Amino acid sequence: MSNKIAILLTVLIAVVACARAQPSRRHPLVQPRSPHGSGHRIVGGFEINVSDTPYQVSLQYINSHRCGGSVLNSKWVLTAAHCTDGLQAFTLTVRLGSSRHASSGTVVNVARIVEHPKYNEYNTDYDYALLELESELTFSDVVQPVALPEQDEAVDAGTMTIVSGWGSTKSATESNAILRAANVPTVDQEECREAYSHDAITDRMLCAGYQQGGKDACQGDSGGPLVADGKLIGVVSWGSGCAQPGYPGVYARVAVVRNWVREISGV
């Protein structure tokens, strides 16, 4: 009997370890009462005003916060392809100029979705989608485009960044109403590949976070901005859980598709 119990415990430990290692996309919360929880913000971060990140938008599916996004110019927003995969443009809007995803600011309809032609839903490679807006934006101190890197512009490991959004905080005590941000350093590409697997982390991906965890993007932040020195270097994409030790957040690297963004949007 004791041998059977020992075998069962060994199998259980292996299953749990395997589950923790499986990367999960920062899938949006389609319904406000998702079984994943009702929180909507960055883990381990701090509240900010949208004027601190005026390029930030809330991408909304049938009037509910789904993902983040970044203003590129008066007609285009960049988000993650896994946020728009399988959806029609008429079901989407963006809210801009508000620190709250559910009120205030300006709401604009999405006219067209352009996902990257190489987007792979199975490994989340090329996780980029451009959204053409129905009407032009009016810029102000709370609505501004973000600067973009040049094609293939490198980002040094250890570069401090800011990631923002309304994704899950994993905390029952924090309000889900206000925009949050966290400062996280970029991680060496090889270190990130060792954390996950060499096949999981492609050249279109960029990692950021602390070895000890504690600060990260999470569900509901997908598609949102990772900015360094005023430039949009990443799009919130996926990770193993949220803010887990040893597993940095994974972002879609913007510099790799700079020419594609320019070709589609003119930016």
UniProtKB/Swiss-Prot annotation:
It catalyses: Preferential cleavage: Arg-|-Xaa, Lys-|-Xaa. This is Trypsin-7. GO terms for molecular function: serine-type endopeptidase activity. GO terms for cellular component: extracellular region. Residues 19-41 form a propeptide. The active site is at residues 82, 127, 222. It is an enzyme of class 3 (hydrolase). Residues 1-18 form the signal peptide. Constitutive trypsin that is expressed 2 days after emergence, coinciding with host seeking behavior of the female. Residues 42-266 form the Peptidase S1 domain. It is found in: Secreted. Belongs to the peptidase S1 family. Keywords: Digestion, Disulfide bond, Hydrolase, Protease, Secreted, Serine protease, Signal, Zymogen. Its EC number is 3.4.21.4. The record marks 216 as: Required for specificity. Expressed in the midgut. Expression levels drop a few hours after blood feeding and pick up again 28 hours later. SMART domains: Tryp_SPc. SUPFAM superfamilies: Trypsin-like serine proteases. Disulfide bonds join 67-83, 192-207, 218-242. The keyword Protease applies. One of its GO terms (biological process) is digestion. Its main location: secreted. PANTHER family: GH13245P2-RELATED, POLYSERASE-RELATED.
